[in-house]
């Protein structure tokens, strides 16, 4: 159970960082 909660926390942290960077700077990432 602890591993599942740990993975959820890591995923949420990565999502927060991603959205923070994405909304802080104009999107210049081109695929």
Swiss-Prot record:
What is the membrane topology noted in the UniProt record heading this document? Single-pass membrane protein
Q: Which residues cross the membrane?
A: 3-23
Main location class? membrane
| Organism superkingdom | Bacteria
Q: Name one GO biological process term.
A: photosynthesis
Its localization reads: Cellular thylakoid membrane
UniProt GO cellular component terms: photosystem II reaction center; plasma membrane-derived thylakoid membrane
Which is a Pfam family this sequence falls into? PsbT
Give the UniProt keywords, A-Z.
Answer: Membrane, Photosynthesis, Photosystem II, Thylakoid, Transmembrane, Transmembrane helix
InterPro entries, per the entry? PSII_PsbT, PSII_PsbT_sf
Q: What does this protein do?
A: Found at the monomer-monomer interface of the photosystem II (PS II) dimer, plays a role in assembly and dimerization of PSII. PSII is a light-driven water plastoquinone oxidoreductase, using light energy to abstract electrons from H(2)O, generating a proton gradient subsequently used for ATP formation.
UniProt lists the family membership as follows:
Belongs to the PsbT family.
Note the subunit structure.
PSII is composed of 1 copy each of membrane proteins PsbA, PsbB, PsbC, PsbD, PsbE, PsbF, PsbH, PsbI, PsbJ, PsbK, PsbL, PsbM, PsbT, PsbX, PsbY, PsbZ, Psb30/Ycf12, peripheral proteins PsbO, CyanoQ (PsbQ), PsbU, PsbV and a large number of cofactors. It forms dimeric complexes.
Looking up HAMAP family in the UniProt record yields: PSII_PsbT
Q: What is this protein called?
A: Photosystem II reaction center protein T
Q: Which organism is it from?
A: Gloeothece citriformis (strain PCC 7424)
Which gene is this protein's source? Answer: psbT
